[in-house]
């Protein structure tokens, strides 16, 4: 992102310059002075302008051989909370640059950087202080929500994360999710030079006052054995610059180390797959235990991700011919069952489990639960999570699975997960016709999950054996999970 602010960056020595960017660039208090540093190798001249000098060109910055411009102010010249920018000249033209490494931006216009003197705990000290040494890398069922989507706050910058934890933690535990994925954390501002809205990747929405609040949110989640992921992505306009790679590596480490975040969920590949591959490798090199997953994408593992986590409605499109709300609820339940047991992970967007997607800036929609179908589906989502996580047979087959096969036949989707100690078969009715199917494999089978039975819709599934052959009968849009016992 910021490497492209001034001209083309081809041929620069980005990695050696920018590694350690957050600790070096931006506004940092060092002894009796506050140093301001920005990377702009092709600039002709750079000035530090801000509320401390009337936004005038009185603080000329000096450039080193690496392309980093620097100036320093005494502690009496700049105060905590002062706004500032970099005024950069190139070919006689000036542009104003918001500091890419600032931890806060102007709350009124989201445009000026704000100087803050903040000291973070290291990841080790964070864990030690909060007694948080649990491993949250095993991601199974994730609940995704926006920070301004659960509390009825009119201003998203005023989110109280401790109150948010009080509201959402009991619900997440009740529903059986293993992780939360938070979106909408980053401040945004309008970049007039590029005529678009830009994320401030180091700035938490709400500024410095919310940093301790977010750390407490993570602590409360960890105490309840819930992992914390954040929605994270590199700017879509980049793709390949070495300085950009180092910058976003540092940004990922900033969130992982300073806030106790357990992992990153990357939903956009628009900055380029090769750039993402290098980025994931770079972060993993610094933090081997960092969990980085893609929100979708079959090639995520090839890019170095720790797999992907599909949205719970991702399989809904394979179901055909739904004509009623009851059929849609049954199809949603089957889609979620099929996805979770086939992929091993699932991401539920807030509101999906109650039959209604969450509106940005709106609190949790309890009215959605006023309908019987939506209430049934919410109960089903909880039962699905707990069945997948707590059933010993499912857990062993999930953990030791050495092959997964998928096929569609006669309007059915059949998923097999085979392991040395057993086999799971997931069968879903895609066409809503219902009917009876023969399980060709010999042996004895046990039905351990029946979607329509949990929903209380249709006749549920029936497993029967005749003359050594096992038959499964499903009602319309039903799904069942079978465990081979012998």
Regions found by a protein language model. Name each.
Residues 1-35, 56-144, 152-156, 163, ...:
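The feature marks proteins involved in alpha-glucan
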Residues 32-35, 42-44, 403-440, 480-483:
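Carbohydrate-binding surface patches
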């Amino acid at each position: 992102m910021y490497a492209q602010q001034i001209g083309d960056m081809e041929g620069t020595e980005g990695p050696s310059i920018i590694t350690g960017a957050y600790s070096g660039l931006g506004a940092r208090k060092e002894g009796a002075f506050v140093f301001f540093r920005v990377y702009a190798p092709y600039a002709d001249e750079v000035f530090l302008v801000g509320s401390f000098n009337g936004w005038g060109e009185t603080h000329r910055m000096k450039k080193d051989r690496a392309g980093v411009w620097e100036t320093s102010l005494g502690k009496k010249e700049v105060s905590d909370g002062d706004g500032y920018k970099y005024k950069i000249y190139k070919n006689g033209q000036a542009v104003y640059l918001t500091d890419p490494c600032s931890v806060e931006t102007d709350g009124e216009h989201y445009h000026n950087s704000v100087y803050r003197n903040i000291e973070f705990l290291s990841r080790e000290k964070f864990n030690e202080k909060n007694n948080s040494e649990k491993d949250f890398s095993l991601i199974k069922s994730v609940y995704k929500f926006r920070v301004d989507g659960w509390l009825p706050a009119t201003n998203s910058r005023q989110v109280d994360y401790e109150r948010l934890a009080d509201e959402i933690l009991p619900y997440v535990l009740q529903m059986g999710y293993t992780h939360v994925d938070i979106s909408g954390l980053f401040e945004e501002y309008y970049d007039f030079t590029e005529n678009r809205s830009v994320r401030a990747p180091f700035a938490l929405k709400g500024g410095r006052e919310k940093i301790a609040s977010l750390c407490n949110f993570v602590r409360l989640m960890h105490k309840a054995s819930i992992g914390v992921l954040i929605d994270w992505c590199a700017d879509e306009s980049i793709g390949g610059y070495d300085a950009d790679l180092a910058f976003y590596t540092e940004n990922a480490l900033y969130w992982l180390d300073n806030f106790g975040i357990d992992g990153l969920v990357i939903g956009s590949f628009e900055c380029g797959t090769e750039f993402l591959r290098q980025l994931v490798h770079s972060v993993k090199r610094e933090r081997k235990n960092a969990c980085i997953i893609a929100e979708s994408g079959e090639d995520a593992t090839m890019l170095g991700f720790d797999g992907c986590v599909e949205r719970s409605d991702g399989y809904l499109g394979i179901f055909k011919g739904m004509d009623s709300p009851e059929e849609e609820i049954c199809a949603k339940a089957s889609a979620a069952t099929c996805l979770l047991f086939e992929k091993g992970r699932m991401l539920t967007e807030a509101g999906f489990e109650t039959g209604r997607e969450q509106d940005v800036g709106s609190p949790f929609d309890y009215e959605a639960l006023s309908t019987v179908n939506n209430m049934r589906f919410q109960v089903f989502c909880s039962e699905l999570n707990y069945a997948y996580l707590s059933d010993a047979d499912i857990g062993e087959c999930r953990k030791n699975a050495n092959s997964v096969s998928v096929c569609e036949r006669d309007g059915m989707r059949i998923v097999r997960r085979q392991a040395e100690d057993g086999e799971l078969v997931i069968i879903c009715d895609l066409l809503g016709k219902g009917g009876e199917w023969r399980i060709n494999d010999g042996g004895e089978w046990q039905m351990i999950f029946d979607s329509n039975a949990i929903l209380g819709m249709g006749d549920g599934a029936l497993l029967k054996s005749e003359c050594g052959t096992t038959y499964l009968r499903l009602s319309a849009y039903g799904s069942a999970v079978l465990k081979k016992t012998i």
